[in-house]
């Protein structure tokens, strides 16, 4: 066969050449692995273009990017869970900008493609406690380009995705009605299929009850298909929980005579979708109660539930749209509270207690969808799901808004008691003139940003006038002691920015949840996430972080995610959860320090210490050999030359001052060192209740060690790498 003529393809080094007389040019010589320079510690370092193919011969802490392999190697973990795998929409890659398609969060070490087994592996988060080395040229160039970034990083936090942007912007548009002759059927079906998310509610007999998009004529065929699949599994004494079709995820939840289905192209896990379906089910129970629902279907299996639910479509649609836009409250199953000084909140709480009426069950003050204060009976707490329903009714749906300043609403709170009704008195305050009754509220679903509502809930049906009198006394007292003015200032101030909470922080946004209080807080979305699309993208990232941390059987406590445009951290302990996002140029050390400062501002001092003790096993990747002579150690420490230590500062010093001085040493550099064996022994003896989760596996002669499988980063300023 005659040799091929013409230009040859570009080689791996990017150098193109022309063939000479039909003979391909010779390939460059293969470089020796031992002579290759090591890659810098960050994938964002600036390098000169190589003149020949270069291989990486040293392990690196950076993961390979799935969207563009720098070395032409594609590695995927086909066993990635459904909850974390990427989904696409109409060809658009909808990923949360993770460093890999694989679930690398469960591993300790990561390597660049083609370098497995070469060199010693590094911790996936190791450089948080290390020091990144940059050449003088890199530092000079980065400083010269610094003025070009600034707040412009807000536009590059997430890469553009025109198809997803267009689909999301049309997500909340109503689907056209199908004409009588069916001439526009194809166009209507395209509109329906283009929606990113659907919620369907149907009876066990297959009768449609609710659909977020489309009328009965449009969804009847789909309802029939879904019911057939569910019935097939039920006939085999099995339960259908979910399935995937192409890039669409279906999640099914059966609740007595009802089947609820979530259909989504958004990156959400099954557990997150089930939480949303549970909220829709609770919304139905808040109208009917569980005994009424069961009685209706016991009498007739094909009962049409749309008649008793008539008028509640607005509430269901408001919930569904909130889930599609992204709801931090639903994701964390927690409530957001209005930021107030402790003295102001104490005054409001005392005022509620002093003015409460005899038949009051729950009393709440809510401002702009955030909880200000609540009074309740002992041993009777309000379920977060119940409060979500109330807030959705007041601040999202339009049903209560049409009633003006006060309303008397019978409703069922399923989390409190799903068998009966309570009665809620709702009064909206005019902050400019609190004693005057508000005559008319905004008719839009958005409402006013500074709305304040007083909610008084009673089990007595005839207590309307009693609760109204309590409301008048409450408002008068709040105005007299200055609480109205404090709430007005807090509402108008809004959420603080990240830099207001942590000055100089590179964070763009974060979510912090207090597990014990079932509350969360977050900074303002502005100026980096101002529109609904940017907020949805941010929630996509939070969804993935939340899924990676909480999906069983993993036991992750710290999860780090790196992408081409952002870097994120998820941190979960028995006391709190933290999710933080920063631009990709942010170092892991800066991200960890900012996360630690947030914890310091949110946790009380005692909880900070407990968190430190309880997460000793989440320490850094490597610890230096002990600088002290062997004779200075306990007998158990002498059995291994390379004894591991931790280096701590003020927290450990304070702990030592409290009575553990005998367990500390000073290194030749005057840095505090504490042997892990001694810490483990002391914690087992003196802090056993606090440190049950921190107990380390026993080595020879009972010496406590940290095995490689347990190495995780603990991003706290009081723990540093030696």
Curated annotation (Swiss-Prot):
For the region Disordered, give the residue spans.
1-58
Keyword Transit peptide carried by entry: no
The UniProt entry, under Pfam families, shows: Fuz_longin_1, Fuz_longin_2, Fuz_longin_3
Q: Which GO terms describe its cellular component?
A: fungal-type vacuole membrane; Mon1-Ccz1 complex; multivesicular body membrane
Q: Does the keyword Coiled coil apply?
A: no
The membrane-topology field of this record reads: Peripheral membrane protein
Q: Keywords, A to Z?
A: Autophagy, Endosome, Membrane, Protein transport, Transport, Vacuole
Location(s), subcellular? Endosome, Multivesicular body membrane; Prevacuolar compartment membrane; Vacuole membrane
Specify the domain of life of the species encoding this protein. Eukaryota
Where primarily located? membrane
Fetch the InterPro entries from UniProt: FUZ/MON1/HPS1_longin_1, FUZ/MON1/HPS1_longin_2, FUZ/MON1/HPS1_longin_3, Mon1
> Per the UniProt entry, what are the Gene Ontology biological process annotations, in alphabetical order?
autophagy; protein targeting to vacuole; vesicle-mediated transport
Skewed-composition ranges (Polar residues)? 9-21
Q: What family does the entry list?
A: Belongs to the MON1/SAND family.
* Function text: In complex with CCZ1, is required for multiple vacuole delivery pathways including the cytoplasm to vacuole transport (Cvt), autophagy, pexophagy and endocytosis. The MON1-CCZ1 complex acts at the fusion of vesicles with the vacuole, through its regulation of the SNARE complex during the coordinated priming and docking stages of fusion, and particularly at the stage of tethering/docking.
Name-wise, this protein is Vacuolar fusion protein MON1
Q: Which gene encodes it?
A: MON1
């Amino acid at each position: 066969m005659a040799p091929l003529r013409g230009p040859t393809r570009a080689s791996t080094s990017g150098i193109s050449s022309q063939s000479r007389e039909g003979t391909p040019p010779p390939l460059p010589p293969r470089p020796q692995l031992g002579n290759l320079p090591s890659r810098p510690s960050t994938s964002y370092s600036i390098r000169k273009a190589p003149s020949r193919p270069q291989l990486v011969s040293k392990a690196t802490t950076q993961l390979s990017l799935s969207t563009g392999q720098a070395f032409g190697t594609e590695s995927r973990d086909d066993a990635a869970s459904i909850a974390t795998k990427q989904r696409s929409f109409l060809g658009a890659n909808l990923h949360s900008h993770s460093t890999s398609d694989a679930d690398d969060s469960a591993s300790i070490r990561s390597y660049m493609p083609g370098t497995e087994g070469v060199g010693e592996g590094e911790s996936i988060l190791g450089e948080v406690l290390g020091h990144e080395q940059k050449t003088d040229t890199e530092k000079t160039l980065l400083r010269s380009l610094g003025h070009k970034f600034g707040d412009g990083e807000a536009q590059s936090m997430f890469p553009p995705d025109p198809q997803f942007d267009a689909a999301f912007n049309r997500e909340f548009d109503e689907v056209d009605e199908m004409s009588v002759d069916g001439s526009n059927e194809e166009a209507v079906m395209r509109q329906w299929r283009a929606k990113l998310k659907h919620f369907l509610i149907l009876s066990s007999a297959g009768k449609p009850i609710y659909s977020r998009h489309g009328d009965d004529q449009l969804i009847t065929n789909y309802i029939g298909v879904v019911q057939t699949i569910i019935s097939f599994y039920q006939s085999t004494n099995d339960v259908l929980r979910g399935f995937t079709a192409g890039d669409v995820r279906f999640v099914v939840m059966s609740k007595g005579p009802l089947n609820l289905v979530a259909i989504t192209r958004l990156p959400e896990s099954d557990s997150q979708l089930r939480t949303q379906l549970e909220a829709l089910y609770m919304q139905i129970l808040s109208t009917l109660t569980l005994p009424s629902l069961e009685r209706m279907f016991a009498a007739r299996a094909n009962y049409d539930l749309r008649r008793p639910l008539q008028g509640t479509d607005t509430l269901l649609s408001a919930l569904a749209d909130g889930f599609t836009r992204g709801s931090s409250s639903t994701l964390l199953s927690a409530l957001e509270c209005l930021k107030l000084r402790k003295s102001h909140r104490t005054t409001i709480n005392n005022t509620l207690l002093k003015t409460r009426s005899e038949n009051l069950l729950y009393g709440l003050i809510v401002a702009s969808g955030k909880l200000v204060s609540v009074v309740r009976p002992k041993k009777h707490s309000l379920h977060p799901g119940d409060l979500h329903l109330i807030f959705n009714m007041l601040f999202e749906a339009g049903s209560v808004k049409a009633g003006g300043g006060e309303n008397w609403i019978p409703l069922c709170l399923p989390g409190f008691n799903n068998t009966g009704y309570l009665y809620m008195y709702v009064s909206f305050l005019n902050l400019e003139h609190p004693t005057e009754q508000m005559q008319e509220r905004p008719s839009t679903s958005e409402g006013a940003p500074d709305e304040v509502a007083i909610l008084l809930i009673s089990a007595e049906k005839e207590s309307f006038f009693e609760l109204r009198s309590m409301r008048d006394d409450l408002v008068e007292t709040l105005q007299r002691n200055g609480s109205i003015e404090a709430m007005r200032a807090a509402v108008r101030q809004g959420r603080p920015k990240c830099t207001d909470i942590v000055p100089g922080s590179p964070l763009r946004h974060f979510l912090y949840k207090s597990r014990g209080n079932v509350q969360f807080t977050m900074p303002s979305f502005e100026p980096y996430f101002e529109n609904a699309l940017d907020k949805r993208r941010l929630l996509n990232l939070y969804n993935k972080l939340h899924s990676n941390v909480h999906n069983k059987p993993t036991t992750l406590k710290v999860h780090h995610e790196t992408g081409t445009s952002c870097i994120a951290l998820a941190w979960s302990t028995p006391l709190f959860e933290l999710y933080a996002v920063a631009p990709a140029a942010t170092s892991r050390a800066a991200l960890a320090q900012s996360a630690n400062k947030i914890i310091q501002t949110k946790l009380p001092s005692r909880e900070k210490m407990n968190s430190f003790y309880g997460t000793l096993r989440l320490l850094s990747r490597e610890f230096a050999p002990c600088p002290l002579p062997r004779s200075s150690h306990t007998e158990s420490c002498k059995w291994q030359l390379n004894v591991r230590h931790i280096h701590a500062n003020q927290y450990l010093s304070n702990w030592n001052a409290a009575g553990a001085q005998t367990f500390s040493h000073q290194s030749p550099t005057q840095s505090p060192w504490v042997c892990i064996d001694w810490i483990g022994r002391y914690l087992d003896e003196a802090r056993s209740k606090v440190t049950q989760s921190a107990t380390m596996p026993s080595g020879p002669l009972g010496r406590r060690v940290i095995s490689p499988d347990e190495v995780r980063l603990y991003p706290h300023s009081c723990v540093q790498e030696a």
